């Protein structure tokens, strides 16, 4: 080292770093600092700026003395000669710490990479599962919809119900309506439906099988039904209902002329003909009201009291009249034999269906037109019956009270065949409500059990044999003209 009094001196710097040794000259005036020395060493050895190193020098004994401050550098310059030998010692502990930190960072990077890979795999799996479930959910409704379509097509392809089942239901739907119509509204059937529709086939014609089968389920009425209803009045006979669901016989209020034939039912036919009645009552009831109340549509002239004389075929359905000498059980008719004084056979068949209609205003006071002697019509009783024995009907028929009885049906004055104002049947006119009591000339047989005695017709009431005692005058006001009227 060069000593000078303020003069610049030069010092040779020898620096060592591991295997690298370098020399340089330092020009200073004994004012060199440690920082200047560190910068020169870094520049000389090409050390990085962030390098953490320590400078040490060798003294005279050969020891390495650390240069930590500027005073240490000044002492090294005074004690050493013209050459300053500096050794660069790098702090390995700090470097090792940094290296460890770097390794940890690298490990962390690897771990993060692994986690990212696992997360990506999980995300892919979840996305795949979700996609699979979504695809399954989307495909399942399509399959069910397809199944529904196939099921619907199978239903559409099924054949319709067979036609016989529909045909089998037709009688069940039609017949109750007919039955209900004739059961619940018996008085209005003739007014609502034309008379031609009520025509029932004569007894000699066979009723179709479909009607027999449709109405065969209803049992025929028992025999005890006839005569079960008590008479409303003791003066006239009451006739129970026969095979028809109609209002009770006790209702003798004066209804319209069209409804009277339902209230006054026909008397029961002879006991011998119950088999024919019980075999066909329901068929007649469901088809035509004239058949309900005693027989087919009339073929004779109209009677005075609104009835029609039944044709010859009426006896075939309700039974033929009994033989001679035997009284008829259905109406108490006398036998045909001369000792009894009754009318000839055939003049007292089954009673007409509408035999007790209320008389019309035009039917009183005049004799009826001549009638035919068709078999089955009522023959008038003889003239020599006891007067006053003609049973008058009750006053509920609507006729004014007459001198002959409560109903105004008493006998007319003797010899007056058609006196005005008389309500009884005229001379020679049929009008007897029943057979006269036995004993007189022309008396009928005793009435059956359960029927009250019936009075005899007034004198002069006999008509032509075979004539209709219930024939009414032509063109009676308030009555419908039947197409079968002769």
From Swiss-Prot:
Output one GO MF annotation.
Answer: identical protein binding
Q: What role does this protein play? A: In its hexameric form, promotes the accumulation of sec-16A.1 and the COPII subunit npp-20 at endoplasmic reticulum exit sites (ERES), also known as transitional endoplasmic reticulum (tER), to positively regulate secretory cargo trafficking from the endoplasmic reticulum to the endoplasmic reticulum-Golgi intermediate compartment (ERGIC) and Golgi apparatus. Required for the assembly of proteins, such as the GTPase rab-6, at the Golgi apparatus. Plays a role in negatively regulating cell death and promoting cell and body growth.
Q: What is the protein's name according to its record?
A: Protein tfg-1
What subcellular locations does the record give?
Answer: Endoplasmic reticulum; Endoplasmic reticulum-Golgi intermediate compartment; Mitochondrion
Natural source organism: Caenorhabditis elegans
Taxonomic superkingdom: Eukaryota
Q: Indicate the principal place this protein occupies in or around the cell.
A: endoplasmic reticulum
Q: Which SUPFAM superfamilies match?
A: CAD & PB1 domains
Q: Effect of gene disruption?
A: RNAi-mediated knockdown in embryos results in lethality prior to hatching and an increased number of apoptotic cell corpses at the comma stage of embryogenesis. RNAi-mediated knockdown in developing larvae results in smaller adults which have reduced locomotory muscle and epidermal cell sizes, and reduced total body protein content. Cell size defects are suppressed in a ced-4 n1162 or ced-4 RNAi mutant background.
InterPro entries membership: PB1-like, PB1_dom, TFG
Chain intervals for the UniProt region annotation (Disordered): 197-486
What keywords is this UniProt entry annotated with? Endoplasmic reticulum, ER-Golgi transport, Mitochondrion, Transport
Segments forming domain PB1 = 10-91
GO BP annotation list: COPII vesicle coating; endoplasmic reticulum to Golgi vesicle-mediated transport; maintenance of protein localization in organelle; negative regulation of apoptotic process; protein secretion; regulation of cell growth; regulation of cell size; regulation of multicellular organism growth
Tissue and organ expression note: Expressed in intestinal, hypodermal and muscle tissues. Highly expressed in the reproductive system.
Q: Which cellular component terms (GO) are annotated to the entry?
A: cytoplasm; endoplasmic reticulum exit site; endoplasmic reticulum-Golgi intermediate compartment; mitochondrion
**Where does the record place Low complexity bias?**
283-294, 302-319, 345-365
Q: Does the keyword Lipid biosynthesis apply?
A: no
The record lists its disulfide bonds as none
């Amino acid at each position: 080292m060069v000593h000078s009094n303020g003069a610049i001196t030069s010092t040779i710097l020898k620096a060592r770093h591991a295997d690298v040794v370098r020399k340089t000259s330092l020009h200073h005036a004994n004012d060199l600092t440690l920082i200047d020395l560190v910068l020169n060493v870094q520049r000389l050895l090409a050390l990085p700026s962030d390098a953490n190193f320590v400078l040490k020098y060798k003294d005279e004994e050969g020891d390495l003395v650390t240069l930590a401050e500027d005073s240490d550098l000044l002492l090294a310059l005074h004690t050493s000669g013209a050459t300053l030998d500096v050794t660069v010692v790098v702090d390995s502990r700090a470097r090792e710490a940094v290296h460890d930190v770097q390794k940890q960072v690298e490990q962390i990077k690897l771990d993060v990479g692994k986690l990212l890979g696992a997360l990506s795999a999980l995300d892919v799996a979840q996305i795949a599962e979700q996609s699979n479930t979504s695809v399954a959910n989307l495909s399942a409704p399509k399959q069910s919809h397809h199944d529904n379509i196939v099921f619907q097509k199978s239903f559409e392809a099924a054949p319709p119900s067979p036609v016989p089942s529909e045909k089998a239901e037709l009688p069940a739907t039609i017949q109750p309506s007919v039955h209900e119509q004739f059961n619940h509204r018996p008085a209005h059937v003739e007014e609502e439906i034309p008379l031609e529709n009520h025509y029932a086939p004569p007894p000699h014609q066979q009723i179709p099988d479909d009607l027999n089968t449709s109405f065969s389920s209803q049992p025929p009425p028992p025999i005890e039904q006839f005569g079960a209803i008590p008479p409303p009045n003791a003066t006239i006979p009451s006739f129970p209902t026969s095979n028809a669901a109609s209002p009770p016989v006790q209702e003798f209020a004066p209804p319209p002329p069209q409804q009277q034939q339902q209230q006054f039912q026909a008397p029961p036919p002879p006991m011998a003909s119950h088999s024919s009645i019980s075999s066909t009552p329901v068929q007649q009831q469901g088809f035509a009201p004239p058949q309900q109340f005693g027989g087919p549509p009339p073929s004779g002239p109209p009677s005075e009291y609104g009835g029609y004389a039944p044709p010859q075929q009426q006896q075939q359905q309700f039974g033929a009249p009994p033989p001679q000498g035997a009284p008829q059980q259905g109406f108490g008719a006398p036998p045909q034999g001369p000792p009894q004084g009754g009318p000839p056979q055939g003049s007292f068949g089954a009673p007409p269906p509408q035999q007790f209609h209320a008389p019309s205003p035009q039917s009183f006071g005049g004799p009826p037109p001549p009638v035919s002697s068709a078999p089955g019509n009522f023959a008038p009783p003889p003239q020599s019956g006891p007067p006053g024995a003609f049973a008058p009907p009750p006053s509920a028929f609507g006729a004014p009270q007459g001198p002959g009885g409560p109903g105004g049906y008493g006998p007319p004055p003797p010899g007056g065949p058609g006196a005005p104002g008389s309500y009884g049947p005229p001379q020679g006119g049929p009008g007897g409500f029943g057979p006269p009591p036995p004993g007189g000339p022309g008396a009928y047989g005793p009435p059956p059990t359960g029927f009250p005695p019936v009075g005899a017709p007034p004198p002069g009431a006999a008509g032509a044999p075979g004539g209709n005692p219930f024939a009414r005058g032509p063109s009676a006001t308030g009555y419908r003209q039947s197409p079968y009227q002769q």
